[in-house]
Amino acid sequence: MESKITLKTTVYNTVFEDLIEGRYKPNEILTEGALVERFGVSKAPVREALIELCKDGILRSLPRLGYQIVPVTLQEMIDLLDFRVDLELSNLRRAAGRITESDIRCLRELQLNLGHDYSEEVIPHWSLNMQFHMALCQLSGNAYTSKVLYAALHQSSRFVSQYFKAAWSKARESEGRYHMAIVDALAAGDIATAEQMLRKDILAVKEEIQLSLK
C-alpha cells in the first residue's frame, strides 16, 4: 500500500509540475496508456493520480478520449487573487502583536532567497514565493487559514503556468520590492503599511498579466 501511494504521488506531482512549466498546453489531452508507458508503472497508480488531478480541477475526464488539461480563465485568476487579498490581509491584521524578532529574521531570509533567484523557470521561483506567503500567513497561528491559503496558492500555480512568462520580468521586480517593504514594515511594527504592501504585491501579478494581454 505504501508503494502504491508513493507512485500515485509521484505521477501526480510530475504531471502537475510539467503543466506549471508549460510542457503541457491548455486543452491538451493526456492518456492513461501514455503515462503508464512514461512512468513504467501499472495502471492503478496512474489512474488514481489522474482521478486526483480531476478532483483538483486540473484535468477533466473525457470518456474514450483521455484527460484534458483544464485552461484557467482570466476571470478565475482575478477571483483567486482577490480572494487571496481578503484572506492574507485579514490574517496579517490578526498576527499583529504576535510577531517576534525571530519571525522577522525568517521572513528576511526568505525574501533574500527570492531576490537572488534569477531563474525564469516557473517552479523554483513560485516555490520561493509560496514559502514567503505561507510564512507570513503562519504568523497568526491559525492552522486552518494556513491550510486554505496553501490550497489557494496551489491553485494559483495553474494560472502562473499560463501567464507567468509574459509578465515575468516586471512582476518579479515588483514582487521583490514589495516583499522587502512588507518585512521592513513588520520589523517597524507598522502593520498598516505591511498590509498596503501585501495588497500591492498580490495584485501586481494581476496588473502585469492584464497589461501583457492588451
Residue map of PLM features:
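Short linear motifs at protein or domain termini
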Residues: 1-97, 138, 211-214
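Short helix-capping and inter-helix turn/linker motifs at the boundaries of alpha-helical repeat units
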Residues: 6, 105, 170-174
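A short, ordered amphipathic alpha-helix with a cationic face
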Residues: 54-55, 79-80, 121-124, 168-172
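Short alpha-helical transmembrane interface motifs in multi-pass membrane proteins
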Residues: 73-74, 162-165
